[in-house]
Curated annotation (Swiss-Prot):
One of its GO terms (biological process) is UDP-N-acetylglucosamine biosynthetic process. This is Bifunctional protein GlmU. The gene is glmU. The active site is at 369 (proton acceptor). Keywords: Acyltransferase, Cell shape, Cell wall biogenesis/degradation, Cytoplasm, Magnesium, Metal-binding, Multifunctional enzyme, Nucleotidyltransferase, Peptidoglycan synthesis, Repeat, Transferase. Binds 1 Mg(2+) ion per subunit.
């Protein structure tokens, strides 16, 4: 459902000085996605008619990295030339929003507020002039405090740096900075803001006191989980938030039947779907979209990215797999690298220290030791000996290799592409193949072994 008179403003212009980084804070990734992208994805489900993102520090980088073409709701980028505070940032957007429109204000470094929480906040707005998201924290350090009068009404927000007495320090209810108000009201309140001397900035939070003193009603609500309002101001904050995100994802996967042997040593940087009786050992990283069939086993320290794995596959430790499809009952690893465009058909076997790129390996085919295969179509029941190399690059272009069914390739062979090897061919160990080979042939190109009589090896004099 989309509301015609309801827009969102996301503030993402700050430098993030405490991050001590050249990368804009909102472009740090959690779970394989930029923090700002997480937030936009959530807001898209709230029902707003448009989203305005205020950018400033390295805004061009932010616009380039954030994918907005995937959304049906328009996302507009608004530049804040001078970084003079959150109050000024919102003022930059309001000329583009009609006076009677409701405005949801959020922060790009608070990425995990849920759409359900925001929908509840929108419902509360129908009962008041400002609906605010607050939280009660055992340790509110760093957050602005909610000040209430004796009747319990919100009268102001005191920023952490402006706390001056013990009573204010004891306040546990904090401001998340997230609220909804009418555009015309915001314009009036913001027009009366003055800068804070300590930072020479306009604080958006000051509008709460202005609104209260003008007789406007302010209601609050808390999220179900304080994880939703966790923000990032430093590298330490980022690590804490990422850890909590991973813990929640792991619990969901465990609840769905996935066996993760050590939840503290598993990293999900995308999405994972899985079948039954799947086992994941320690230090496994999942990136992009990964699909695991039934009874899949993944050994320690593997990385899987954008990969589809069929039933009963075993992936042994230290294998790195990207954009690959692995067939039924195949075995991979240890120490294997499968690069984009690789397809392993059922019951194939790729072993120690093998690299494969843009290659189809047929059913029951094996390449078990120390090989590189690139840009190849390899048939069924092919045995590729240890140390075999497909020479697919001539310095300018990549070339294809085609290998038929039932081929045996001896150890330490080189296949110089472009080349076609027919069915049932046998290639002797140490052979360099430079021309096409017809079906059923046996070839060898190495020199014959011979002895040199009476030859003495030179030795160093001691």
């Amino acid at each position: 459902m989309s509301y015609i008179n309801f827009s969102a403003i996301i503030l993402a212009a700050g430098r993030g000085n405490r991050m001590l980084s050249d990368t804009p804070k909102v472009l740090y990734q959690i779970g394989g996605k930029f923090m700002l992208q997480h937030l936009i994805d959530s807001v898209m489900q709230v029902g707003v008619s448009s989203i305005y993102v205020v950018h400033g520090y390295k805004g061009e980088m932010i616009i380039k990295e954030i994918n907005t073409n995937q959304y049906k709701i328009p996302v507009y980028w608004i530049l804040q030339h001078d970084l003079t505070g959150t109050g000024d940032a919102v003022q930059r957007v309001l000329p583009f929003i009609s006076d009677d429109e409701e405005v949801l204000v959020l922060y790009g470094d608070v990425p995990f507020v849920s759409y359900k929480t925001l929908q509840r906040l929108h419902v509360i707005k129908s009962q008041c002039d400002i609906s605010m998201l607050t939280a009660t924290l055992p340790n509110p350090k760093g957050y602005g405090r909610i000040v209430r009068n004796q009747e319990g009404s919100v009268v102001s927000i005191i920023e952490h740096d402006d706390i001056i007495n013990d009573d204010q320090k004891k306040i546990k209810e904090v401001s998340t900075g997230i609220f909804i108000a009418i555009s015309n009201h915001l314009k009036c309140w913001l027009s009366t803001l003055t800068t804070h001397k300590s930072k020479n900035e306009f604080y958006l939070t000051d509008i709460i006191q202005i609104a209260h003193q003008s007789g406007y009603s302010i209601h609050t609500m808390c999220p179900d989980d304080t994880f939703e309002i966790m923000g990032v101001n430093s590298k330490s904050d980022f690590v804490d938030l990422d850890k909590q995100y991973q813990q929640r994802k792991v619990q969901c996967l465990l609840s769905s039947g996935l066996m993760i042997i050590d939840p503290n040593r598993f990293d999900l940087r995308g999405t994972l779907v899985h079948g039954k009786d799947v086992y994941i050992d320690i230090n496994v990283i999942i990136e992009g979209h990964v699909s695991l069939g039934n009874r899949v086993k993944i050994g320690a320290s593997c990385i899987l990215k954008d990969t589809i794995v069929a039933d009963d596959v075993e992936i042994y430790p230290f294998s790195i797999i990207e954009n690959t499809t692995i067939g039924f009952q195949s075995k991979v690893g240890p120490f294997v690298r499968l690069r984009p465009g690789t397809e392993l058909k059922e019951k194939s076997h790729v072993g120690n220290f093998v690299e494969i790129k843009n290659t189809r390996l047929g059913e029951q085919s094996k390449v078990k030791h120390l090989s590189y295969l690139g840009d190849a179509e390899i048939g069924n029941q092919v045995n590729i000996g240890a140390g075999t190399i497909i020479c697919n690059y001539d310095g300018m272009m990549k070339h294809q290799t085609i290998i038929g069914d039932d081929v045996f390739i001896g150890a330490d062979s080189q296949l110089v592409a472009p080349i076609t090897i027919g069915k049932n061919v046998t290639i002797g160990a140490g052979t360099t193949v430079t021309r096409d080979v017809a079906a059923n042939e046996t070839i060898i190109s190495r020199i014959r072994q011979f002895s040199i009589l009476n030859w003495k090896r030179l030795k160093n004099k001691k």
